[in-house]
Amino acid sequence: MNRIEGHLLAADLRFAIVSTRWNHLIVDRLVEGAELAFVQHGGKSENLDHFIVPGSHELPLVARRLAETGKYDAVVCLGAVIRGDTDHYKFVAGGAASGILNSALHTGVPIAFGVLTTETVEQALNRAGIKAGNKGAEATLAMIETVNLLRQIR
């Protein structure tokens, strides 16, 4: 049996990051982690474009448009949705997740769901690099690997 995996080399890749302005103190850390992961794996910062949207609800549409341009090998969506006292959290997080997945499937371009969905601000900060790694970096690494795997399949 042949085992085929993507490698973590971003030297010739061009990525778009789409991040939310909402919860920017958390999201800014995710963006920093994403950029660092891209560069540490051979990517050039000039091959990384950063787009900012108001909130997580806007991520899927902008990600899809970016994917459709053909300029990007992958799109990394970053945000933070923190549970509050109403059901708003469920609709925003669920809508963003399904919209991002549908955008990737529709365009054939890998699009990462790097949106934190947490109960508290503390949990979100931990996942943005304080204690539990940086989920922005993890989303970027997943896209580097996925793009390189897809190149082997074509």
UniProtKB/Swiss-Prot annotation:
Entry binding sites for (2S)-2-hydroxy-3-oxobutyl phosphate: 85-86, 127
Biochemical pathway: Cofactor biosynthesis; riboflavin biosynthesis; riboflavin from 2-hydroxy-3-oxobutyl phosphate and 5-amino-6-(D-ribitylamino)uracil: step 1/2
Span of the signal peptide: none
Taxonomic path: Bacteria, Thermotogati, Deinococcota, Deinococci, Deinococcales
SUPFAM superfamilies from the UniProt entry: Lumazine synthase
Function as written in the Swiss-Prot or TrEMBL entry: Catalyzes the formation of 6,7-dimethyl-8-ribityllumazine by condensation of 5-amino-6-(D-ribitylamino)uracil with 3,4-dihydroxy-2-butanone 4-phosphate. This is the penultimate step in the biosynthesis of riboflavin.
An annotated Gene Ontology molecular function: 6,7-dimethyl-8-ribityllumazine synthase activity
GO cellular component assignments: cytosol; riboflavin synthase complex
Keywords noted in UniProt: Riboflavin biosynthesis, Transferase
InterPro entries tied to this protein: LS, LS/RS, LS/RS_sf
Keyword Ribonucleoprotein attributed: no
Protein name per Swiss-Prot or TrEMBL: 6,7-dimethyl-8-ribityllumazine synthase
Active site: 88
Chain residues that bind 5-amino-6-(D-ribitylamino)uracil: 22, 56-58, 80-82, 113
Similarity comment text for this entry: Belongs to the DMRL synthase family.
EC number in record: 2.5.1.78
One Pfam family from the record: DMRL_synthase
Reactions that this protein is recorded to catalyse: (2S)-2-hydroxy-3-oxobutyl phosphate + 5-amino-6-(D-ribitylamino)uracil = 6,7-dimethyl-8-(1-D-ribityl)lumazine + phosphate + 2 H2O + H(+)
GO BP terms: riboflavin biosynthetic process
